[in-house]
């Protein structure tokens, strides 16, 4: 089956753009895998006041 260069470019962009976007989001987070959902010390806490 023959493919055109347009099809190859479209497939590459279809995979590459979301991958680069997600890697950029991961790198831009300061905590890495830790998020505010699991940690009360991060911004965006689930409760308005921290537990004492």
Swiss-Prot record:
Bias class Basic and acidic residues marks the residues at: 42-52
What membrane topology term does the record carry? Single-pass membrane protein
Q: Where is this region: Disordered?
A: 31-52
Matches recorded under Pfam families: PsbM (PF05151)
Q: Which keywords does the record carry?
A: Membrane, Photosynthesis, Photosystem II, Reaction center, Thylakoid, Transmembrane, Transmembrane helix
Known function: One of the components of the core complex of photosystem II (PSII). PSII is a light-driven water:plastoquinone oxidoreductase that uses light energy to abstract electrons from H(2)O, generating O(2) and a proton gradient subsequently used for ATP formation. It consists of a core antenna complex that captures photons, and an electron transfer chain that converts photonic excitation into a charge separation. This subunit is found at the monomer-monomer interface.
The entry sums up its family as follows: Belongs to the PsbM family.
Q: What is this protein called?
A: Photosystem II reaction center protein M
Kindly list the organism's lineage. Bacteria, Bacillati, Cyanobacteriota, Cyanophyceae, Synechococcales
């Amino acid at each position: 089956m023959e493919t055109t260069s347009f099809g190859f470019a479209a497939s590459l962009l279809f995979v590459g753009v979301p991958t680069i976007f997600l890697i950029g989001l991961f790198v831009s987070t300061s905590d890495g895998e830790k998020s505010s959902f699991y940690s009360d010390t991060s911004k965006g806490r689930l409760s308005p006041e921290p537990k004492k």
